[in-house]
């Protein structure tokens, strides 16, 4: 009796599995980082969740980075307490911070595209500090462009008043960008395999 060897069949390409795993990982990381937050007056907490958004876009690129943050938002919409201060559900997303959550999804995709100038990401260690900084600033601009008008509409205040309230966050967000650029620049060995 001749022995036949079973041939392995890939149902899903290994690159797709890697990207999906990365998206799930960064969705979880964003959820964990959201729990490190400080509630400020006005209903918008200062949190570390933008780090998850930044790294998802930079490391996974525009498609999978955006998908990762979308997954995070969908898990929160489904009721898991993954948003800042343990928030969850449709009511939370329709509240003052909902625009920022939507902005996070768009920002991850935009900053991933700006950084890589393509839908397919290259290794993040190949990116210059200037392109990483530009990408992060573009992502941050998207977050504010979606979040501030949403905040104004939900709170029933003027756009100027909402922008003024959010000005407290700008310095902290710029520090987050500086730290992210530093990690990318200094983490060559650790980050080299993410592409």
Task: Locate the predicted segments by residue.
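Short helix-capping/hinge motifs at transmembrane helix termini and TM-loop junctions
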Residues: 34-38, 60, 76-80, 84-87, ...
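Residue-level signature of transmembrane alpha-helical entry/exit and packing/kink sites
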Residues: 15-23, 46-53, 65, 92, ...
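Membrane-embedded alpha-helical hairpins and interfacial helices in multi-pass inner-membrane proteins
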Residues: 42, 120-195
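Short helix-perturbing small/polar motifs within transmembrane alpha-helices
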Residues: 2-9, 18, 25, 32, ...
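Alpha-helical transmembrane segments in multi-pass membrane proteins
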Residues: 22, 26-30, 53, 57, ...
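Alpha-helical membrane segments and adjacent membrane-interface helices in multi-pass membrane proteins
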Residues: 36-109
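Hydrophobic transmembrane alpha-helices
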Residues: 2-64
């Amino acid at each position: 009796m001749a022995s036949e060897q079973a041939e392995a069949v890939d149902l899903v390409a290994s690159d797709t599995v890697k990207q999906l795993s990365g998206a799930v990982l960064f969705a979880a990381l964003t959820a964990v980082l959201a729990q490190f937050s400080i509630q400020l007056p006005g209903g918008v907490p200062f949190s570390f969740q933008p780090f998850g958004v930044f790294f998802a876009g930079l490391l996974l690129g525009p498609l999978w980075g955006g998908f990762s943050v979308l997954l995070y938002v969908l898990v929160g919409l489904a009721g898991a307490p993954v948003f800042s201060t343990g928030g969850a559900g449709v009511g939370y997303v329709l509240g003052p911070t909902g625009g920022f959550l939507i902005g996070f999804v768009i920002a991850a995709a935009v900053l991933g595209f700006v950084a890589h100038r393509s839908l397919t990401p290259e290794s993040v260690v190949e990116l210059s500090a200037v392109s990483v900084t530009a990408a992060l600033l573009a992502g941050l601009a998207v977050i504010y462009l979606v979040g501030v008008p949403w905040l104004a509409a939900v709170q029933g205040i003027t756009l100027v008043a909402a922008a003024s309230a959010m000005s407290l966050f700008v310095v902290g967000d710029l520090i987050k960008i500086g730290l992210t650029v530093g990690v990318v620049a200094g983490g060559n060995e650790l980050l080299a395999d993410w592409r």
